[in-house]
């Protein structure tokens, strides 16, 4: 049994009075059962709490993937999955290859990538396919390249999807998941071990996030108004961490500048 290391996380947000009112008002009006002529304190509190939870959840989600404790700023409270897998890769614990900077300019290369990861995957990972929990976790450029490849197929279905869009992408029955973290990847320094373009094939259950908001001294959740700054502020202090349970059932490919070990 693997123990997930937890680190202290402090998330604090500030909103101007006008912005805060607009966000809370939008959340309230989106609820059909609310009577705007007779708002209660409970309804307002629920809207504020929802706003807070959404912001905290996004902060945890981004750190869960791009977190790097060696970074001077940004998502540095705990190491995310990408750094952990990159470390495994550097130690030759997972199947890995690198691709060139312009590889995704050719949409068909995304298919070659998926195929290579599957063919070279650990047999344990292949055996798990029938359970329906495998996924290709990809950066947005890889997702876009695969979508463009599907658009180029000369079928009626491809044309319809080109017009209407696709809700989900799959490759041989395995979901292709766009992690939607491009804005966070763009902020990483050039020396960051976290790749800006990548694809990971693994079982969803192999990636574990742990959050503890109650059992550690100093943990707190607060919402208050700061009259000096005229801001509504929200703060959460808690313990969180994530890890890859088993590096064996992981196949990994990524872009690394100036490395051309494999030409797709």
Q: Residue ranges of each PLM-predicted region?
A:
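Assembly/oligomerization interface modules of large self-assembling protein complexes
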Residues: 1-29
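Short helix/loop capping segments that flank catalytic or ligand/cofactor-binding pockets
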Residues: 23-24, 61, 145-147
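Alpha-helical scaffold segments that mediate packing/assembly in large oligomeric complexes
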Residues: 32-120
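Extended oligomerization regions of viral-like shell subunits
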Residues: 112-212
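Membrane-proximal bilayer-interacting regions
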Residues: 215-222, 227, 231-235
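Acidic, proline/serine/threonine- and glycine-rich low-complexity intrinsically disordered segments
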Residues: 249-251
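Conserved small/polar residues in nucleotide/adenosyl-binding loops
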Residues: 253-262
């Amino acid at each position: 049994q693997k123990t997930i290391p937890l680190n202290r996380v402090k998330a604090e947000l500030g909103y101007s009075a006008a912005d805060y009112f607009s966000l809370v008002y939008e959340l309230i009006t989106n609820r059909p059962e609310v009577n705007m002529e007779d708002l209660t304190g409970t309804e307002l509190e629920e809207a504020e709490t929802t706003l807070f939870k959404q912001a905290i959840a996004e902060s945890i989600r981004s750190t869960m993937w791009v977190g790097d404790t060696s970074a001077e700023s940004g998502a540095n409270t705990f190491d995310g999955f990408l750094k952990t897998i990159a470390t495994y890769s550097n130690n030759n614990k997972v199947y890995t290859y690198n691709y060139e900077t312009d590889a995704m300019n050719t949409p068909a290369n995304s298919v070659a990538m998926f195929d290579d990861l599957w063919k070279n995957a650990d047999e344990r990972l292949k055996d798990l396919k029938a359970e329906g929990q495998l996924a290709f976790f990809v950066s947005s450029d890889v997702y876009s390249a695969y979508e463009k490849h599907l658009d180029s197929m000369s079928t009626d279905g491809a044309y319809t999807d080109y017009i209407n869009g696709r809700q989900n992408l799959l490759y041989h029955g395995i979901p292709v998941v766009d992690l939607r973290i491009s804005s966070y990847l763009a902020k990483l320094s050039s020396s960051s071990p976290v790749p800006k373009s990548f694809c990971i094939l693994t079982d969803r259950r192999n990636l574990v996030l742990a959050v503890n908001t109650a059992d550690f001294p100093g943990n707190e959740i607060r919402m208050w108004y700061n009259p000096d700054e005229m801001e509504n502020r929200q703060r959460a202090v808690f313990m969180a961490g994530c890890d890859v349970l088993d590096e064996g059932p992981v196949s990994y490919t990524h872009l690394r500048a100036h490395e051309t070990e494999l030409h797709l």
